[in-house]
Amino acid sequence: MTVDYLRDPKSIYRQSFATIRKEADLSKLPEDIADVVVRLIHACGMTDIVEDLVFSKDVVRSGREALQQGAPVLCDARMVAEGVIRSLLPAENEVLCWNSHPECPVMAKKMETTRSAAAVEFWRPQLVGAVVAVGNAPTTLFRLLEVIAEGVGPPAVILGFPVGFVGAVESKELLIKQCGIQNQRVELGKTVPFLTLSGRRGGSAMAAAVVNALAKTTKT
C-alpha cells in the first residue's frame, strides 16, 4: 500500500510554520516574541494559546543573552531537559534536572513537599543568571518564587509552563504578580523577565520548545 503524504522534512516545517502564521493572530506581539510563539504553537498544536500568553517584553532578549553567556538551563522535569536540543545551545550550556538526584527525595521528605519543589534547593548555586524552564510541576514554580522572594538569584528568565488542575493556574498567577504586573502585555518585569501561559495548559514540550526557540535565535 502506498500512502500519499508529505515526506520532506524541510517542506513539513515550512508548511507547518506557514499554517501557524496564517491561523494564529500574532499581530499584537512584538516580532521577537512572535517568532518564539510560532515555535511554541508548533510544539502544542493549539493556535488559540496566543490570547493566554503573558510575558515581559524583555524576555527574549534576556534569554538570548543568558544563553550566549553560557547560562545553565534549569529544568523541573526530565521530559523538559530531554526536549532541549543540545546542538542549538550557543555555549555548550548545561541542561540540568535535579529530580533524580539521590538526595532529592531526602530533601523532599525533610521539607514535606514534592521532589520537584525540593529540587529547587539544588538550583541555588547556579540560579543567578540561569534560564529556568518549568514545564510540569506547579510546586516547582511556587518554590522558585519563594526562593527569589527570599533574595536568592534571580535567574535571567523564567519560562513558566506548569500544567494541570492543582496549582498550575495559581502558580502562574503568582509568577505574573511577583515578576510583573497583572496585565497580559507586561512592559518590564519588576524582578525577572518571564513568559507563561495563563490557565491550566502547559507542559514539558512547551517549556522545551521555548528554550529551543531562544537558543535557535542565538545560533550563528
Where are these regions (language model features)?
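Short glycine/serine/threonine-rich phosphate/pyrophosphate-binding segments
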Residues: 80-83, 139-144, 165-169, 203-207
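Long, charge-dense
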Residues: 89-130
